[in-house]
Amino acid sequence: MESDNLQDPQEETLTCSICQGIFMNPVYLKCGHKFCEACLLLFQEDIKFPAYCPMCMQPFNQEYINDISLKKQVSIVRKKRLMEYLNSEEHKCVTHKAKKMIFCDKSKILLCHLCSDSQEHSGHTHCSIDVAVQEKMEELLKHMDSLWRRLKIQQNYVEKERRTTLWWLKSMKLREEVIKRVYGKQCPPLSEERDQHIECLRHQSNTTLEELRKSEATIVHERNQLTEVYRELMTMSQRPYQELLVQDLDDLFRRSKLAAKLDMPQGMIPRLRAHSIPGLTARLNSFRVKISFKHSIMFGYTSLRPFDIRLLHESTSLDSAETHRVSWGKKSFSRGKYYWEVDLKDYRRWTVGVCKDPWLRGRSYVATPTDLFLECLRKDDHYILITRIGGEHYIEKPVGQVGVFLDCEGGYVSFVDVAKSSLILSYSPGTFHCAVRPFFSAVYT
């Protein structure tokens, strides 16, 4: 490492405390400590949030600032060392006692002007050392940049898989509680069916959890392969220029290109299979009401995104050419229990639920904190179900009618897959305490 030659106190400040090499793309934290950007992020890749400074252990939430001034200082110092090396007597040409200011790319050696004109090096590609250093560093940094972009994407996949695992554990625990509550309201009691349902839920939960962990391990393995090659490139980029020039980097560059072309596993999408609850739809039909919708609005774009869904699913996009319809019930409900069904088989994206007082901003519907929705969106090549309670839900997408059960006294809403007589999900009791009205929005296919 070039840091071995740092004796001057001022030059010691150019050494990264993580890799012990000269800074590459230096950044500094709020606490004042400085590191190579890659070193800092690679150091944090397996550490749970919040991230912390490797020197003082102060949390920094992965916020840092690029130190442009220090980067310039590093460049100046490295060039200064190269010139000191070239000007030293011990590194002059032994034959001609002249400075070696020319680089032979074929032989990978430094030459003086007279040696470069000799018969031995005729036909070889020569250039000044400054140009050779610049070209070598540009090629190194190009490979590093390519791998770094893939590393960041891969790290995002790792973090996403870990979040998915945590949410899966949490959602399965909550779902078990909801299932017990639903069975508790069935008449007559279905204790045996409830126990079988919960046993099936736990089995699927554990099986999926194992698959999620295997998926994470696969992603981590691929990321580590990229990291290994990246560290080699970074180590080479920190070598003194005079050493860097004479290195044969063809094999390293070849492995870098192969690593950059590796397929990146993106993690799995868990799905909870629908499980029928005997008598569920029959019981809910005792609260059946006919809902009349009004104020149906047709437009090519809607900002309907309850709970800022774009922040949770940034890859979810809207097509401005699509036709949206937003409708809400003529009547609001503040007491009692009500159940209605919405036929969704002809829609690829839809939202059902209840809202307080629908209002428009321009030609768009704007959701409020009291709105309780179940929303189906297309994300990449699959569908997701989302709600205000935690974002995405890993539940099998209903293909026909969705039932909506509103309990005003309990202050919650439940959604049912009518065809399979299964619970999609349910908001917790006490979620709202106001009059609400049915809501429906869809995108035409």
UniProtKB/Swiss-Prot annotation:
Signal peptide: none
Binding residue positions for Zn(2+): 93, 96, 115, 121
B box-type ZnF: 88-129
Keyword Magnesium: no
Domain B30.2/SPRY: residue ranges: 271-445
Start-end of RING-type zinc fingers: 16-57
Single GO MF descriptor: zinc ion binding
Zinc among keywords: yes
InterPro entries on file: B30.2/SPRY, B30.2/SPRY_sf, Butyrophylin_SPRY, ConA-like_dom_sf, SPRY_dom, TRIM/RBCC, Znf_B-box, Znf_C3HC4_RING-type
Record-linked SUPFAM superfamilies: B-box zinc-binding domain (SSF57845), Concanavalin A-like lectins/glucanases (SSF49899), RING/U-box (SSF57850)
Sorted UniProt keywords: Metal-binding, Zinc, Zinc-finger
Entry-linked Pfam families: SPRY, zf-C3HC4
Family: Belongs to the TRIM/RBCC family.
UniProt-recorded name of the protein: Tripartite motif-containing protein 43B
Source organism of the structure: Mus musculus
